[in-house]
A protein has these predicted regions:
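Cyclic-nucleotide recognition modules
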Residues: 1, 52-111, 115
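Short proline/glycine- and basic residue-enriched helix-capping loop/turn segments at helix->loop/beta transitions
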Residues: 1-15
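Short loop/turn microsegments at loop-to-beta-strand junctions
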Residues: 8, 26-27, 155
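Residues that recognize and position ribonucleotide moieties
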Residues: 11, 30, 52, 77, ...
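Cyclic nucleotide-binding regulatory domains
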Residues: 17-80
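Long cytosolic regulatory regions associated with cyclic-nucleotide signaling
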Residues: 63, 109, 132, 215-221
Length: 221
């Protein structure tokens, strides 16, 4: 974002670096320029509960940024090499007030985040494994991907089957089996580096009622 040039600090973050812990008091607004940050909580039994991810253009922690909490609700941990921009909350909010067009973009961003969250919740409500996975793929397409060719959405993070298992509550073995079927059916294509979702094939599997044509521009990219 051009408005932030000159007022932000860029940090290169190594993989598996914890940026914020649950309960921390943040010192600045963080914006993902590249890479991916996992957002999660740790339950009383020590189990990790994935809440979502932050990819290029996302900010965190949102509740603190906009004054709705005094500390963080989640852990924020990089899942790959990432570039993170940091800026003071005061400077960030002043820029939004001075530039209404940018404020509108952030309003759009919050709607995007909310929509993604609703799709995530819907995935957990599904009875069958394949339906849970299809909804998570829909979530990834809406929330964490870019359309590089018509109907071809490239996920902005290294989407592993263990990640899908963590988001759905399914076993890794079940995810591996179902993802293999979806790959053969042309819904997805993936390798060690890239993960592609084909919108029309996903729409066909989900059905017209479950699939909405949702478009959001990313804040940064």
């Amino acid at each position: 974002m051009e408005l932030l040039s000159g007022v932000t600090t860029t940090r290169r973050i190594h993989k598996n670096t914890i940026l914020l812990c649950q309960g921390d008091i943040p010192h600045h607004v963080s914006i993902v320029q590249s890479g991916c940050v996992k957002v999660y909580r740790v339950g009383s039994n020590g189990d990790e509960q994935i809440a979502g991810f932050k990819t290029a253009g996302d900010i965190f922690p949102e509740c603190w940024v906009f004054g709705h909490s005094s500390n963080t609700m989640y852990y924020y941990e990089s899942t790959e090499e990432s570039d993170i921009l940091t800026v003071s909350r005061e400077t960030f909010l002043e820029l939004l007030e001075k530039h209404p067009a940018q404020k509108d973009k952030y309003f759009n961003y919050m709607i995007k985040s909310y929509t993604g969250l609703m799709i995530q919740i819907s995935a957990l409500e599904q009875s069958y494994a394949v339906d849970k996975i299809l909804m998570i793929l829909y979530y990834m397409m809406v929330r964490h991907s870019v359309e590089r060719a018509p109907g071809e959405f490239w996920v902005l993070m290294k989407l592993r089957q263990s990640t899908i298992a963590g988001l759905t509550g399914l076993t890794r073995e079940t995810v591996t089996t179902e993802m293999g079927k979806l790959k053969r059916q042309g819904v997805v294509k993936y390798d060690m580096k890239n993960f592609i979702i084909y919108k029309d094939a996903l729409k066909h599997k989900l059905g017209e009622e479950a699939f909405l044509e949702i478009q959001f521009s990313n804040v940064l990219v």
